[in-house]
Curated annotation (Swiss-Prot):
Name of the protein in question: Cyanate hydratase
GO biological process, one term: response to salt stress
Record SUPFAM superfamilies: Cyanase C-terminal domain, lambda repressor-like DNA-binding domains
Top-rank lineage group of the source organism: Eukaryota
Residue numbers annotated as active site: 90, 93, 116
InterPro entries, alphabetized: Cyanase, Cyanate_lyase_C, Cyanate_lyase_C_sf, Lambda_DNA-bd_dom_sf
Length: 162
């Protein structure tokens, strides 16, 4: 399966490369976030059939077989060696370094819970800092999910005495 996924990703990346467009440009044309476009092209997200026409318009060379493949649920996986890529390593390092503080603020602002990575939006933007130098802005926008008290009376899967 992994060889097939790699082949599909390589073909999708070739379509993008041949278009001459960036993920941000494709995102602008499709109404998606730039990270979601990249996720689609790396088979880490499923293409919604309603979005397929705008993606096809943004990438006219996208063949029908790849478009159909993109609408199937993907195998969301990654190469464990990916962490060795410096940009990915630094992103992981930033999350790990700031993670406890972010968790503390989430708990203070929302209560005991987490940020969903399912009902989730992510984007990467380029801005100028106060010093005039380029800065990277990574936005994680996830639904808040509170932890629940596990009362047996609310557990519908548990058999009830009649």
């Amino acid at each position: 399966m992994e060889d097939n996924k790699t082949t599909i990703i390589n073909r999708l990346e070739a379509v993008k490369r041949n278009s001459g467009k960036s993920c941000s440009q494709i995102a602008e044309q499709t109404g998606l976030t730039n990270v979601y476009v990249a996720q689609l092209l790396r088979r880490q997200a499923q293409l919604n059939p309603d979005t397929a026409p705008s993606l096809r318009a943004a990438l006219p060379e996208l063949p029908e077989d790849l478009l159909q493949e993109m609408m199937r649920p993907p195998m969301r996986s990654y190469d464990p060696n990916l962490i060795q890529e410096p940009c990915v390593y630094r992103l992981n390092e930033a999350v790990m370094h700031f993670g406890e503080s972010i968790k503390e603020i989430i708990n203070e602002e929302f209560g005991d819970g987490i940020m969903s990575a399912i009902d989730f939006y992510c984007s990467v933007d380029k801005v100028k800092g106060v010093d005039g130098k380029d800065r990277v802005v990574v936005t994680f926008d996830g639904k808040y999910l509170p932890y629940t008290e596990q009362k047996s009376e609310h557990m519908v899967s548990r058999p009830r005495p009649h």
